Amino acid sequence: RLWKDTVNFYARGYVSNTLPSFYMRHYHSNHYYWDNENMDKEFRTRVEGELNISRWKTNLRAGVENIKNYTYFNQNAMPAQESGNIQVLSATLKQDFRLGILHLDNEVTWQKSSNETVLPLPQLSLYHNLYLLAKIAKKVLTVQLGADVRYFTKYNAPAYTPAIQQFHLQAADDQVEIGGYPIVNVYANLHLERTRKFCREDH
């Protein structure tokens, strides 16, 4: 307990040692063809801790993962493996606030890959949702009006190849960073018994 509030702490961990999927090992089509019989098993270990304070609407989670023989699609949209170890550190804070019918939900994630060339990640991701939530018309109609915003720092996001329907590393001669700008949505949500109407404008 913390100042008479209940505090929950959780610790988790897992270990996995599995072959890459059949799709990563075998694929035949007109434009792409591969048979990777000698792929090694992908070995993953992860430990994380989580702190939750319900009354404060606070949740904090942090962890570290080690990946050996990470399997991915390379710059040529072909399956590949990184024989070394890759570490990924991450921490996420969720904090919600409420004042009457006014709500503000927040989520902040920090993450770091030890090999940005093979496993690029945005270092910081933010999500905020500000809205009014109330019941009207004799409390049978629930109305939610609000706006949310998403943001992540610039990074070399994966490219996409429709022929194999997969994301892969960007080509070396055509590197483009995305991110570094907010994505804002304004929305309205109405709920009356079994009827729900939702509209949203994206930017």
Spell out what each predicted region is.
Residues 1-203:
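Exposed, low-structure sequence patches enriched in small/polar residues
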